Amino acid sequence: MMRTHYCGSLTEAQIDQTVTLCGWVHRRRDHGGVIFLDMRDRDGLVQVVIDPDTPEAFATADKARSEYVLKITGRVRRRYEGTENPNMVSGQIEVLGKEIEVLAASETPPFPLNDDTINVSEEHRLKYRFLDIRRPEMLERLRFRSKVTNLIRNYLDDHGFLDVETPILTRATPEGARDYLVPSRVQNGSFYALPQSPQLFKQLLMVGGIDRYYQIAKCFRDEDLRADRQPEFTQIDIETSFLNDDDIMDLMEGMTVKLFNDLLGVKFEKFRRMPYSEAMRDYASDKPDLRIPLKLVDVADLMQEVEFKVFAGPAKDPKGRIAALRVPGAGSLTRSQIDEYTKFVGIYGAKGLAYIKVNEIEKGIEGLQSPIVKFIEPIVMQLLERVGAENGDIVFFGADKAKIVNDAMGALRVKIGHDLNLATCEWAPLWVVDFPMFEETDDGKWTSVHHPFTLPKSSVEDVKSNPGEALSVAYDMVLNGTEVGGGSLRIYTLEMQKAIFEALGISDEEAEEKFSFLLNALRYGAPPHGGLAFGLDRLVMLMTGATSIRDVIAFPKTKTAECPLTQAPAPVEANQLRDLGIRLREQQKKEA
């Protein structure tokens, strides 16, 4: 072997031992004829000292520069008193270098790798990702990710799950986002689709008797990107037979508790289980951040008789909502701050942001500061009583279609909570349960809230007669306002699956064309089954404190789904397209 130890693993236990290290020059310093090299590998740093008593080694060290790859042999010794570095594992020792070999020289990197902070664009970092990964922060995140997947595998193995791979080349099925399509050369004119999830295959594995399945699965979705989205992402995919929803949630909660305890030293209590209706009512979100102790209060019933159309209209609209958000002690917010919050809710479609500052509530109307009080004077004190307002508070109001109010006020609640440092704890996990089975589109059609294979709590007859009232046996794990996992029990009878397709407007012919393999499987004794999928990238992002999942993926894509490193996606040769029976429109125009 080329080395005996990793740089970052050396401690006082190796004092007086001769060691051989391989790594990169993190920093080089020349102090009065003695050269100091901070050597770095994936485990960390160690200081190497080279003095003129070893002229060959000294000459080599004198030529070495940042990011040179060196092999160094030397003796471990204790650092002189006063030169210890308590911030390093190896901070009590150093290596007196005797032999140095340059394994590879390096050009000057396009950005420094030895600074704690990096002032360079993300795209530039991604273009040189092989260098960016060398930074200790990136190395630690990827190491942490490996620990997460290893612990998950061990947990699931210990609970009887089998690691089974499912196909990457499959067929397009309606799962909500656009598919990435792969043309077939052999079956000209036909296309594979890269899987958005292994959903149907894992259900078929349950029909096949696998009983407990898991997979660290690559998934692909051609959709608009955000901080927590990538065109290709990794899913911890899980499915079980003969367990109910409580069993599955308990099992997955146990895995999450172990993850946080073993890797972060964080101890979770029993996860709260919150119905979807409560989450939307109190937090205007199906993934509420419970660290923030602010709740919305419905006040539409009080607004129905006011003459102020901004409130009266939504109050009388069956699809409208008026929600109040009381922020204790925030009455000192300035007009410019309120204007910024007004702009913020505008991002979500809100037309404005009404507010009341409560200065001296005992004075009634005179003790309030607001441009809307004069329009709602008859009910304003009732409003304040309902929300529990006290002196020094401010109360914000959202009034519009329910979706706009929920999006705007839910986001405002979180933003104000962070801006004013209102969070009461570091971690707040919960399960959101009892989701609606369907939601109505603008054109009056039904669409699945999760996916069309989710088991409803309703009977077949109720699904057919009143789909809007159906709830699903679905559950999402939410952590700090982020959905880290979602799952459900699945439909396992042909009759129910056909009823769901019918409610969604999928004809028998279309169902047979797209899902014949699933429908056929349901004819041969499918067990009751269900599962869950965790977003690995998102989970690791939260656990490491990263601001984007791109910071916990080795080679991510940009927000425009491009790879600056490899220049993917890229044009291909004309003969490759001919083999696939494809001609680009641009080519056709040029040839014409």
UniProtKB/Swiss-Prot annotation:
UniProt-annotated binding residues for L-aspartate: 175, 221, 450, 490
Statement: the UniProt record of this protein carries the keyword Cytoplasm: yes
Annotated GO MF terms: aspartate-tRNA ligase activity; aspartate-tRNA(Asn) ligase activity; ATP binding; nucleic acid binding
A Pfam short name: tRNA-synt_2
GO cellular component: cytoplasm
Site (Important for tRNA non-discrimination): 31, 82
Top EC class of this enzyme: ligase
UniProt keyword terms in alphabetical order: Aminoacyl-tRNA synthetase, ATP-binding, Cytoplasm, Ligase, Nucleotide-binding, Protein biosynthesis
PROSITE patterns per record: AA_TRNA_LIGASE_II
Stored Gene3D superfamilies: Bira Bifunctional Protein, Domain 2 (3.30.930.10), GAD-like domain (3.30.1360.30), Nucleic acid-binding proteins (2.40.50.140)
Positions of the UniProt region annotated as Aspartate: 199-202
Key word Aminoacyl-tRNA synthetase present: yes
InterPro entries the UniProt entry points to: Aa-tRNA-synt_II (IPR004364), aa-tRNA-synth_II (IPR006195), aa-tRNA-synth_II/BPL/LPL (IPR045864), Asp-tRNA-ligase_1 (IPR004524), Asp-tRNA-ligase_1_N (IPR047089), Asp/Asn-tRNA-synth_IIb (IPR002312), AspRS_core (IPR047090), GAD-like_sf (IPR004115)
Subcellular compartments: Cytoplasm
Catalytic activity entry: tRNA(Asx) + L-aspartate + ATP = L-aspartyl-tRNA(Asx) + AMP + diphosphate
EC number: 6.1.1.23
Record-listed ATP binding positions: 221-223, 230, 483, 535-538
GO biological process: aspartyl-tRNA aminoacylation
Subunit-level organization: Homodimer.
UniProt record similarity statement: Belongs to the class-II aminoacyl-tRNA synthetase family. Type 1 subfamily.
Stated role: Aspartyl-tRNA synthetase with relaxed tRNA specificity since it is able to aspartylate not only its cognate tRNA(Asp) but also tRNA(Asn). Reaction proceeds in two steps: L-aspartate is first activated by ATP to form Asp-AMP and then transferred to the acceptor end of tRNA(Asp/Asn).
Protein name: Aspartate--tRNA(Asp/Asn) ligase
UniProt organism field: Acinetobacter baumannii (strain AYE)
Gene: aspS
